């Protein structure tokens, strides 16, 4: 898709926000287990990527984006500016994740921009289903991550 000018996005739905983003004692954001795993796996894949002849531009593109910058979380935000779990009522199938929804909708053009300095994000983590209307055609992978207890 890269050579057709399409930026591919991947969407991860996760069970708990703190699996993606936590906060230290001073309130500074730090990676949760899923963000750490993602960055480790991303680096491993990038180092072991075997491309075909003529795919040098794609490799340069990937190498121009750090693992830390190629993913982002879109979650509800509390009054302190911290990411929090969305509340889903039993009778609803969507969440009150208004901040996440607005952020994705308002920055849709930027999100699709292939310039890695302007828009490095290609992997999006969210706590709950996005409301109708987020019809981004560039999302080709959607998965659910949930920490198991076994």
Where in this protein do the model-derived segments appear?
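Conserved C-terminal RecA-like helicase domain
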Residues: 1-124, 132, 148-149
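Catalytic or ion-translocation cores adjacent to nucleophile or general acid/base/metal-coordination motifs
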Residues: 140-150
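Short glycine-/polar-rich loops that comprise or flank the Walker A/P-loop
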Residues: 8, 136-141
């Amino acid at each position: 898709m890269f050579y057709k000018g399409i930026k591919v996005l991947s969407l991860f739905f996760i069970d708990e926000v703190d699996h993606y983003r936590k906060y230290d004692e001073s309130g500074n954001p730090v990676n949760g287990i899923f963000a750490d795993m993602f960055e480790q796996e991303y680096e491993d894949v990038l180092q072991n990527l075997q491309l075909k002849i003529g795919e040098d531009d794609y490799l340069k593109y990937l190498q121009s984006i750090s693992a830390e910058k190629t993913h982002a979380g879109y979650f509800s935000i509390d009054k302190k500016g911290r990411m929090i779990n969305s509340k889903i009522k039993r009778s609803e199938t969507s969440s009150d994740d208004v901040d996440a929804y607005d952020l994705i909708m308002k920055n849709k053009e930027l999100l699709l921009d292939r310039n890695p300095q302007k828009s490095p994000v290609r992997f999006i983590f969210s706590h709950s289903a996005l409301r109708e209307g987020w019809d981004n055609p560039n999302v080709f992978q959607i998965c659910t991550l949930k920490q198991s207890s076994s």
